[in-house]
Amino acid sequence: MMFQRLEDLRVDNDLRQRDVAEYLHMHLEVYRRYEKGIREIPVWAVIQLAKYYHTSTDYILGLSDSPEPPQKTRSK
């Protein structure tokens, strides 16, 4: 599921795999392998993609069906 979400987010944002790979400072083929599920995506990349797409890491990982980012909580 996570791999499909990576592709869906990219396509929904009218981006090419090359665009996302450049944002993550990695080779295109490495990113392609993440989308195909051939290679496990590192935590740092999931965090960066969540920020980039304004969504949650849980959504990217398939742990949530809501693409909305988590609400920030105020500390006293």
Regions found by a protein language model. Name each.
Residues 1-12:
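A short, Lys/Arg-rich alpha-helix, primarily the initiator
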Residues 5, 16, 42-45, 56:
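Residues that mark the N-terminal boundary/hinge immediately upstream of a DNA-recognition element
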Residues 11, 22, 51:
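Alpha-helical residues within the helix-turn-helix
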Residues 14-33:
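Short alpha-helical DNA-recognition segment
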Residues 25, 44-59:
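DNA major-groove recognition helix of helix-turn-helix/homeodomain DNA-binding modules
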Residues 61-76:
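Short, charged recognition helix plus adjacent turn
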